[in-house]
Regions:
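Intrinsically disordered, low-complexity regions
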Residues: 28, 32-34, 68, 80, ...
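Aromatic-capped interface at the extracytoplasmic side
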Residues: 63-73
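Hydrophobic membrane-insertion alpha-helices, especially the h-region
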Residues: 46-60
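Intrinsic low-complexity, intrinsically disordered segments enriched in polar/basic residues
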Residues: 8, 15, 20, 41-42, ...
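Membrane-entry signal-anchor segments at the cytosolic-membrane interface
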Residues: 34-48
Length: 365
C-alpha cells in the first residue's frame, strides 16, 4: 500500500512569504497615505534678505571706490609742500573765465600767458635745492599717424602749436636729468564749450566751481599747476626729474602730445608718462588706462591713499566703441612709454557741450 507523502514542516512556503510581503507593502502604503514629502525650499524672506545683502554690498563697494574722497584743504592747511584743492580751484576759475580757448583763438593765447606767469612764479619761489626750468615750445609743423583708436590709418598734419614745458630737477641727484616722469594735460578746449562763470562759492568742507566747461580740461591744468608748486618745495622729496607738459592741440587729433614727444629735446629723457583727462564734469579721478608695464599701476596702488581704477574701461576704450582718444595713446604707441591715464567722468552727458553748467565739486580736483 502506497503512503501519501507528507509535507515537511521545515520546507519553505514561498507562497506564504509572497502573501506576507504583499500585505506588508499594503500596510506601509496605508500608513504613508496622506503624508506629503516636500523638497527644501527657501522662503520669500530668505530671498529678500539675500537681495538686500547684495544691494548693500554693491553700494558699499561703490562708496569706497568712488565716494571715498579726501577733505579739501586750503593753502594754509596744505602748507608749502601739500596740495590745496582750494588753490587749484582758483586756477580753474581763472581759466574758465576766458571762455572757449580753441587753437588759433585769442583765448588760447591768454590761457598760455596765465599758465606761463604761474610757472614763472613757481620758479622764483622754488626751494634752493630744486632746479626749475620753464620752456615755451613752438612747433612749426608735424604729422602723426596712429595704429589704433579713432585716428587709426589717418594722417593728421599740424602746424604753429605752442606748448609750455616745466622741468624740475633735484640738485643733489644729477642722474635725475636722464630719468624723468612726464605729467601731461592739454590747455585747449573745443569751440562748443563755454567758459563763463556765475560765481565761486566757498563752503566749510567743499567748494564748487559753478562754471560751464570746467572739465576738459581746465581742471587738469589747474591740478598740474598746484602739484608743480608743491613739488618745487620738496628739497629731498624726489629722485627723478619731473616734466610738466601743458600742451595745445589735443582736441585736434592729439597733435600737442605728438609734437612734443617727437620734437622736444627733453622727451628722450622720459621714462614714464602720466596723463590727466576729463570726460565729464565731476566724480573721482580714476585710472582707466595703464601699462603696458605694470610698475606704474602697482606703485600707484601701493602708495595712493584713495586708489581707484577699472581695467574694463581700457578694453572698451581700445576696442573703438567709444569714439574718443587721449594723449596717453601717443605716449604709449609713439614713444613706447608705460604709465597711467586718469579721468573723471560724472555727468558725461554735458561733456563737450555749451550746457556743461553742472558744478565741479572741489573734491574732484
Amino acid at each position: 500500500m502506497r503512503r501519501r507523502p507528507e509535507s515537511s514542516s521545515t520546507a519553505p512556503d514561498t507562497s506564504a512569504k509572497k502573501s506576507s510581503g504583499t500585505s506588508k507593502t499594503d500596510e506601509e502604503a496605508k500608513l504613508n497615505h496622506g503624508i506629503q514629502i516636500r523638497t527644501a525650499r527657501r522662503s520669500s524672506f530668505t530671498w529678500l534678505t539675500l537681495f538686500a545683502v547684495i544691494v548693500y554690498s554693491s553700494w558699499a563697494v561703490y562708496q569706497y571706490q568712488y565716494e571715498n574722497l579726501p577733505v579739501p584743504l586750503t593753502a594754509e592747511q596744505a602748507g608749502k609742500r601739500g596740495f590745496s584743492e582750494v588753490a587749484a580751484m582758483k586756477h580753474v576759475k581763472a581759466l574758465t573765465e576766458l571762455g572757449p580757448h580753441t587753437i588759433g583763438s585769442d583765448a588760447i593765447e591768454l590761457a598760455l600767458q596765465y599758465v606761463l606767469a604761474e610757472l614763472e612764479n613757481i620758479k622764483k619761489t622754488a626751494h634752493w635745492e630744486v632746479d626749475v626750468e620753464v620752456d615755451l615750445f613752438h612747433v612749426t609743423v608735424g604729422a602723426t599717424r596712429l595704429d589704433s583708436g579713432m585716428f587709426v590709418d589717418r594722417t593728421i598734419i599740424y602746424s604753429d602749436l605752442d606748448h609750455i614745458v616745466l622741468r624740475m630737477l633735484p640738485k643733489y641727484a644729477p642722474e635725475a636729468r636722464e630719468n624723468a616722469i612726464l605729467v601731461s594735460s592739454h590747455i585747449d578746449t573745443v569751440f562748443s564749450t563755454s567758459g563763463y562763470s556765475d560765481y565761486f562759492s566757498l563752503r566749510k568742507t567743499s567748494l564748487c566751481c559753478f562754471r560751464e566747461g570746467a572739465g576738459d580740461c581746465s581742471s587738469c591744468v589747474s591740478v598740474m599747476l598746484e602739484l608743480a608748486r608743491g613739488i618745487s618745495q620738496w628739497a629731498h622729496g624726489f629722485k627723478n626729474a619731473v616734466i610738466f607738459l601743458f600742451n595745445t592741440g589735443e582736441e585736434e587729433g592729439l597733435s600737442g602730445a605728438h609734437s612734443f614727444i617727437t620734437q622736444h629735446p627733453w622727451s628722450t629723457t622720459i621714462r614714464m608718462a602720466i596723463d590727466l583727462e576729463a570726460m565729464g564734469i565731476g566724480g573721482k579721478s580714476a585710472i582707466f588706462q595703464a601699462g603696458p608695464h605694470p610698475l606704474a599701476v602697482e606703485t600707484f596702488a601701493s602708495v595712493a591713499k584713495y586708489p581707484s581704477g577699472n581695467i574694463i574701461f581700457q578694453d572698451i576704450f581700445s576696442s573703438g566703441v567709444i569714439k574718443s582718444a587721449t594723449d596717453f595713446q601717443v605716449y604709449r604707441e609713439v614713444a613706447g612709454l608705460s604709465g597711467l591715464d586718469f579721468v573723471y567722468a560724472d555727468h558725461g552727458a554735458v561733456y563737450h557741450t555749451k550746457v556743461s553748467s553742472v558744478s565741479l565739486p572741489l573734491f574732484t580736483i
